[in-house]
């Protein structure tokens, strides 16, 4: 359990993590929202923050401040040079992290939040200000879905993975397939929809000028064995 410092505590009975995120991202700041779900209900803690500096993974490791961001699949080749990196990508940075200048931890059990980074009075002033109104939800227009690799290529990779496992070359292989679909919906609309329909225990939303990441991550599982429910 986290101990709270009374000098940095903010009452959150009228404030949600998403509302705090909308306030902190004003002014063009790079921002992030980390949430979790436990047994179908919002988890105990949520984290909201923002910053004006974006750094790579190498810089994030040495900056000495809290960071939130991502590592692309291409980073695996740095950890294991024998791993091939797909040639076709999204022309995205291999890594990108927001250095948190303001960081707030919500405790939903206590109905309170604590300022972990930034001046408490400045952060409290932002959170107590008017909430920016998100764009009204609309009937989004979507195009056709493109999947990479194709179904045939993906199924062929599954067969190859099984061969490696049977041969003892590996005990776990994670295959992925990227789905792309053009849409008129905003990144925030997509995140709010994912929060409602996707049964995942981990949620995150991050954005900066020209960049948006929204995701819910499922738990990994394995084939059921015996009579134990999975």
Q: Language model features by range: what are they?
A:
Residues 1-230:
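Extended alpha-helical targeting/anchoring segments
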């Amino acid at each position: 359990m986290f101990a709270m410092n009374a000098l940095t505590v903010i009452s959150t009975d009228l404030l949600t993590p998403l509302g705090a995120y909308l306030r902190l991202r004003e002014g063009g700041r790079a921002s992030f929202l980390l949430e979790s779900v436990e047994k179908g209900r919002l988890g105990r803690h949520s984290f909201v923050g923002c910053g004006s500096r974006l750094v790579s993974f190498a810089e994030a490791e040495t900056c000495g401040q809290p960071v939130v961001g991502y590592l692309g699949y291409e980073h695996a080749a740095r950890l294991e040079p024998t791993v091939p990196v797909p040639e076709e990508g999204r022309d995205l940075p291999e890594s990108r992290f927001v250095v948190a200048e303001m960081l707030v931890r919500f405790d939903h059990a206590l109905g309170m939040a604590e300022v972990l980074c930034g001046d408490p009075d400045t952060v409290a002033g932002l959170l107590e200000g008017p909430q920016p109104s998100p764009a009204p939800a609309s009937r989004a227009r979507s195009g056709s879905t493109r999947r990479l690799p194709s179904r045939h290529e993906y199924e062929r990779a599954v067969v190859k993975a099984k061969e490696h496992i049977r041969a003892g070359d590996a005990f776990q292989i994670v295959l992925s397939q990227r789905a792309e679909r053009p849409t008129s919906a905003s990144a925030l609309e997509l995140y709010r929809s994912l929060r409602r329909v996707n049964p995942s225990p981990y949620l995150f939303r991050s954005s900066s000028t020209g960049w948006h990441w929204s995701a819910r991550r499922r738990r990994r599982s394995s084939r059921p064995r015996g009579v134990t429910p999975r």
